[in-house]
Regions:
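Short glycine-/acidic-enriched loop or helix-start segments at secondary-structure transitions
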Residues: 16, 66-68, 92-93, 198-199, ...
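Gly/Ser/Thr-rich active-site loops/lids in small-molecule metabolic enzymes
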Residues: 146-154, 195-199, 203-223
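Glycine-rich phosphate/pyrophosphate-binding beta-alpha loops
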Residues: 131, 188-200, 264
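ATP/nucleoside-binding phosphotransfer catalytic cores, i.e., glycine-rich phosphate-binding loops
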Residues: 175, 181, 205, 215-283
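Catalytic core of DAGKc-family lipid kinases
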Residues: 4-6, 30, 35-39, 73-188
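Short glycine-rich anion-binding loops that position phosphate/pyrophosphate groups of nucleotides
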Residues: 11, 60-63, 85-88, 132-134, ...
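ATP/NTP phosphate-donor binding region
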Residues: 1-58, 65, 69-70, 103, ...
Length: 283
């Protein structure tokens, strides 16, 4: 089996770099020829390596997103393994990958194939979540240097400012043959289960062909935080709308910033669907 290790040396303070030679030896002991390649986000990581059987990605959700989108653009679908080494590793967490690098590498080397869902919005793919509104674009507003220096504290600082400047987002939502209009403060469309390691969609499944959509109605900052807390403790507040669907259309009259897996997302209107079983994960 031929495999490619695509690693983001800037993710998680570069902790993957010191493990690369050991990972190559580990895969070789399982009959897998692994070629390491540092990711350059302006380039095609698969150039010259289109016929691989397995791609192992080391980084956070944004790194996995980048690689999956390049796979789709190339029209290739090798098995995909994930070594979580970024600040945000929600998708890797959803499939139960260990946070320790060598344990994750061993899980992949010994692993089997699992077909899981992937989200798609107007030609762009996401593995974990598409989102917009308060707190949801914190990752793309936080500078990489801050992430490397203080990790999650950088997200908290940016998120606190986000709470104080939140505003209503007028939405028209079409889902399961029904339409609704709502002033929202936050919307998350999950393929995975967590955002920022917070279990906002704990009952979501990666292999059911469905998206889990959470829409939080607009209110003041205190009430908004209270409603989200009630949702987290399964209090089912009326201000939180939970939809399950295979596809959804979302429109807005304002130009709100959106986010997919921690990276800048598309503009409105958006047609979002679940591509059931389209990822060949190895773990």
């Amino acid at each position: 089996m031929r495999a490619l290790l695509l690693y983001n040396s800037r993710a998680g303070r570069g902790r993957i770099v010191g493990h690369i030679s050991k990972i190559v030896e580990l895969f070789d002991s399982h009959g897998i020829s692994l070629k390491p390649k540092e990711l350059e986000f302006g380039c095609d990581p698969f150039e010259g390596d289109e016929d691989i059987d397995l791609v192992v990605v080391s980084g956070g959700d944004g790194t996995v997103n980048f690689v999956v989108n390049k796979m789709r653009q190339r029209g290739i679908n090798p098995q995909l393994g994930i070594i979580p080494s970024g600040t945000a590793n929600d998708f890797a967490g959803a499939i139960g990958m260990p946070r320790m690098i060598m344990r994750a590498a061993e899980r992949i080397a010994k692993g089997t194939e699992h077909n899981v869902d992937c989200g798609e919005v107007d030609g762009t793919w996401f593995v974990n979540v598409l989102s917009f509104g308060v707190l949801t674009t914190t990752s793309q507003q936080t500078q990489d240097k801050e992430k490397q220096l203080v990790g999650r504290l950088a997200y908290i600082r940016t998120g606190a400012h986000d709470l104080m400047t939140m505003h209503p987002i007028p939405l028209k939502v079409k889902c399961n043959g029904k339409e609704m209009e709502i002033d929202a403060v936050m919307c998350l469309v999950f393929n995975g289960m967590t955002a920022g390691s917070i279990p906002l969609a704990p009952d979501a499944k990666l292999d059911d062909g469905m998206l889990d959509v959470l829409i939080l109605e607009y209110n003041n900052p205190v009430t908004t935080c209270f409603n989200m807390f009630r949702h987290l403790v399964k209090g089912h507040p009326g201000a939180v709308h939970h939809l399950r669907c295979s596809e959804i259309e979302i429109r807005s009259t304002i130009d709100e910033r959106t986010d997919i897996d921690g990276q800048p997302g598309p503009k409105f209107p958006m047609h979002i669907r679940c591509a059931a079983g389209s990822l060949r994960l190895r773990y």
